[in-house]
């Protein structure tokens, strides 16, 4: 009798487990998967595209050279943006064409340099899910670091390194979780660490090259092409 009752109980338990599994699978199958590109539940929403920039070759006479294609405001196509250069020899950064895009190249610089963009309409909130998306190429062992200029005027560099090993790649930079350091705007050298900087009020955003360029050919340098910033605007 006990064996029979035990067998009946085991059979009922197995049936209930099987039924629960079947119900779970059916419910999961009926739950629609999130559409590609939509936000997953519980995650902070991605900010919208605040600005984008596709650089251009500046006006010049004759064939393109290192001298007549140097970066000025004329390389910027977005009328809402200003380009800023930092470093003793940053003025020799030039525009060039690769893969049918225009990029900025630091190969001829004899000093560290930084390139940033400033939105004339608003400050930038780079907290949370804000992202900088940039098509970049680093050559040899050259690396890039994210740079921000705060509303209080301080230029900061992040400890996150960017390297693409000679390929043009679309790189996304998240600004949270980084350690930040004061960046000397004249020499582009790293100073003291800044703890918890206010990334809710950023004036400029860009990248720094903490070593000089290596010249033409397969040498240490970086190319900076199309760029997009996904962030919330902050009134100036």
Task: Specify the residue positions occupied by each region the protein language model found.
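Initiator methionine at the very start of the polypeptide chain
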Residues: 1, 29-30
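Intrinsically disordered, low-complexity segments enriched in Ser/Pro/Gly/Ala and basic residues
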Residues: 2-5, 23, 220, 224
């Amino acid at each position: 009798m006990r064996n029979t009752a035990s067998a009946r109980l085991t059979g009922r338990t197995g049936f209930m487990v099987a039924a629960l599994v079947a119900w779970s699978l059916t419910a999961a199958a009926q739950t629609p998967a999130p559409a590609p590109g939509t936000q997953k539940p519980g995650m902070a929403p991605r900010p919208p595209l605040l600005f984008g920039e596709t650089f251009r070759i500046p006006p010049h006479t004759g064939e393109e050279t290192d001298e007549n294609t140097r970066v000025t405001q004329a390389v910027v196509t977005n009328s809402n943006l200003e380009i800023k250069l930092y470093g003793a020899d940053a003025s020799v950064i030039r525009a060039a064409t690769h893969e049918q895009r225009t990029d900025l190249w630091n190969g001829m610089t004899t000093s560290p340099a930084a390139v940033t963009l400033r939105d004339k309409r608003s400050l930038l909130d780079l907290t949370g899910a804000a992202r900088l998306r940039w098509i970049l190429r680093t050559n040899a062992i050259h690396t890039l670091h994210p740079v921000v200029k705060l509303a209080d005027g301080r230029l900061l560099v992040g400890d996150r390194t960017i390297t693409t090993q000679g390929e043009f790649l679309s790189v996304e930079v998240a600004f949270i979780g980084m350690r930040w350091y004061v960046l000397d705007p004249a020499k582009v050298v790293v100073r003291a660490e800044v703890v918890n900087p206010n990334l809710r009020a950023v004036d400029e955003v860009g990248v720094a090259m903490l070593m000089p360029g290596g010249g033409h050919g397969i040498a240490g340098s970086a190319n900076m092409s199309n760029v997009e910033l996904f962030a919330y605007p902050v009134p100036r």
